């Protein structure tokens, strides 16, 4: 694909194309990181990117750049074709769609798929080998159901969803439009509900359901549990990484992002636009306000106000955590000082 053709495609996108210098208008075969790119590949740089130094000797064919004069001057001096955009990372994502367009599977039903006669599969949907779809389930139009997916009874899947190999949707689960459930993810599994008795643990029946609103993506190996009653709800546009556990009765707002190994205990309430970094834990019934950011391994035991940035275990304001971390490294020296003071203090 010629760089000039790619520029025309970016003009219709959302990355804010400002201007471009086509140079020799390279024919691009793909994309790569700047320090690994070849003459027929595209790359990008953001302001302050650690790879900026690589631009002086990179073999890259074309670049997406921020409006940063030193980078523009260097690219011009080296004769590299480039485009200046408001958001280079977003432009790169749009460019990858152009350079590597997805090939949709043919819209048919594989002969090894097992579909209950009371299930409905919408037009334009592709159902791959060894898929199982239970009674009363409805799969919308233009969906892609990859091999080995199991859809239990009474599941409703809206239009344009994609279920990757071996994903499992338990009874009563509801998926909005354009949801993606990746391989080995489980939606609607039984919540961890048991009642202690004199004879041991008595299982609490989990009769609720899981609802994924429009545009939710669930990573590989993640699980979203259904509650005993009511629902577990994931807000529209929320993105869930691999190996995330979301407990029964949790609700999240719109546009959240949860990184790998996040664990959210039952009944927690997560606001809109919340970002939880890797291995963050949220306690049972904790309320996390809108736009909260929690750094990796933070343990959220109590409610967190909207807009807060928290770190540490238990989670505290990030700036306070930085001061505590700095003090922690000085504890051995402080302990020695205290011991010396005790030795030198008359009893």
From Swiss-Prot:
Keywords, alphabetical: Acyltransferase, Lipid A biosynthesis, Lipid biosynthesis, Lipid metabolism, Repeat, Transferase
Metabolic or biological pathway, per its Swiss-Prot or TrEMBL entry: Bacterial outer membrane biogenesis; LPS lipid A biosynthesis
GO molecular function annotation: N-acyltransferase activity; structural constituent of carboxysome shell
GO terms for cellular component: carboxysome; membrane
GO biological process: lipid A biosynthetic process
EC number: 2.3.1.191
Pfam families for the chain: Hexapep, LpxD
Stored NCBIfam families: lipid_A_lpxD (TIGR01853), PRK00892.1 (NF002060)
Record-stated family: Belongs to the transferase hexapeptide repeat family. LpxD subfamily.
HAMAP family, alphabetized: LpxD (MF_00523)
Protein name: UDP-3-O-acylglucosamine N-acyltransferase
Species assigned in the record: Parasynechococcus marenigrum (strain WH8102)
Gene: lpxD
């Amino acid at each position: 694909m010629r760089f000039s053709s790619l520029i025309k495609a970016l003009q219709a996108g959302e990355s804010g194309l400002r201007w471009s210098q086509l140079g020799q208008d390279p024919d691009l075969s793909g994309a790569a990181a700047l320090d690994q790119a070849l003459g027929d590949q595209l790359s990008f740089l953001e302001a302050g990117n650690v790879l900026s130094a690589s631009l002086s000797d990179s073999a890259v064919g074309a670049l997406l750049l921020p409006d940063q004069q030193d980078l523009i001057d260097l690219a011009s001096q080296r004769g590299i074709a480039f485009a200046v955009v408001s958001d280079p990372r977003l432009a790169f994502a749009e460019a990858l769609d152009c350079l590597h367009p997805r090939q949709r599977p043919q819209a048919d039903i594989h002969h090894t798929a097992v579909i209950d006669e009371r299930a409905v599969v919408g037009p334009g949907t592709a159902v791959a080998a060894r898929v199982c779809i239970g009674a009363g389930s409805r799969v919308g139009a233009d969906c892609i159901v990859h091999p080995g997916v199991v859809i239990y009874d009474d599941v409703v899947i809206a239009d344009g969803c994609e279920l990757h190999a071996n994903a499992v949707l338990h009874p009563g689960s509801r998926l909005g439009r354009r949801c993606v459930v990746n391989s080995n993810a489980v939606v609607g599994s039984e919540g961890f509900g048991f009642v202690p008795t004199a004879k041991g643990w008595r299982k609490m029946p989990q009769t609720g359901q899981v609802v994924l609103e429009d545009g939710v993506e669930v990573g590989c190996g993640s699980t979203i549990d259904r509650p005993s009653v009511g629902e577990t709800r994931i807000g529209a546009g929320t993105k869930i990484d691999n190996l995330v556990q979301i407990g029964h009765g949790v609700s999240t707002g719109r546009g959240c992002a949860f990184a790998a190994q996040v664990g959210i205990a039952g009944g927690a309430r997560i606001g809109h636009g919340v970002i939880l970094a890797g291995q963050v834990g949220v306690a049972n019934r904790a309320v996390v306000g809108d736009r909260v950011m929690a750094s990796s391994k933070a343990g959220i035991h109590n409610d967190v106000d909207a807009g807060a940035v928290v770190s540490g275990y238990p989670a505290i304001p990030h700036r306070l955590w930085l001061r505590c971390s700095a003090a922690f490294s000085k504890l051995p020296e402080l302990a020695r000082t205290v011991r010396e003071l005790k030795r030198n203090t008359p009893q």
